[in-house]
Amino acid sequence: MILADMIRLINLRLQMFGYTVTEVDSSTIEYQAEKAAQYVCNFCNFNKCPDDIPGALKFVTVDYAIGEFLEHKKTFAPNTLSMLNLDMAVKQIKAGDMDTTFAVGEGSKTHEQRLDAFINYLKSYGKTELMRHRRIKW
């Protein structure tokens, strides 16, 4: 996996969540991308990082980097996260005749609680995939 591709995917994914990436964010995104790649390489015992990360772990690595990025922003610049759309969560999906219900405005969670849950999801997503690609270290 090439680091530049991962940074491009991180920027694209952040836009999907309603976050506008600025020039100020570029160094933090690059750092978090390298940190996420190193985490995956250490967990799976890959020798060459990020070159050894297979395509199957690309999105796991990207989501981990985004979780780290959002946690960093929440700590140091929480006002910049107000543009994130955390209200549109899927409540129910019905397969027969396709019926999708969104949980808009439901529940008593605050914006910060929803953000914390979202960050935790991004940082823990893909543990099964990581376990599948783990190598024995001699």
Language model region names:
Residues Q38-F46, D63, G67-T75:
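Amphipathic alpha-helical interaction surfaces
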Residues G67-W138:
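Short loop/turn elements at secondary-structure junctions
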Residues M1-F59, T110-W138:
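Conserved short "hinge" loops at termini or chain/domain junctions
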